[in-house]
Amino acid sequence: MALTIARTETQLAATTAFQAMDNLMASTVSSSFVVPANVSKLVSVDVGITADGAEECAALLRFAGNGLADGEQYTVCSSIVNAGSATGTSNNYVSKDTDFNVISGNSIECSIAVTDATTISAAVVMTFA
């Protein structure tokens, strides 16, 4: 059975420093979460990201914490490119199959950073099995 955990950020002043994703839509949640019981892998990561106006960036997700058996793991998000005639930009979401070993009952934090300081909104769904 697969289980999912989601995190979002809206209008985040993203930088090259990783920032914890500590929202779930309108709700503020813990920046870390407990790996669900009876799972051993983070099997996929789905992420959608958008930037304001003519901003552009490439984004990276970091998964860190004692819930990762093999240490920190990373996945890349879609890159955002300048769309001069638009009032915002968006790209297709990324669906990434992963094979990250996890430890049930321990914690993981999902954080995001970008190559160029940019105001972004992002949504991430992590699937465990």
Indicate where each model-derived feature is located.
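Short edge beta-strand/loop segments characteristic of extracellular beta-sandwich folds
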Residues: D46-T50
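C-terminal interaction-tip segments
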Residues: M1-N23, T28-P36, D52, A113-A129
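Terminal beta-strand-rich extracellular "head" domains
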Residues: A54-T98
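Beta-strand-rich interaction surfaces with strong enrichment in secreted/lumenal proteins
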Residues: S31-F33, K96-F100
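Short beta-strand/loop motifs in extracellular/secreted proteins, especially
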Residues: K41-V43, E55-A59, T118-A122
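Residues that act as N-cap/strand-start positions at coil-to-secondary-structure junctions
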Residues: S27-V29, V43, N92-V94
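Extended extracellular/luminal ectodomain segments enriched in beta-structured repeat modules
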Residues: P36-S44, G105
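Noncatalytic modules at the cell exterior or secretory-pathway interfaces
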Residues: D99-D116
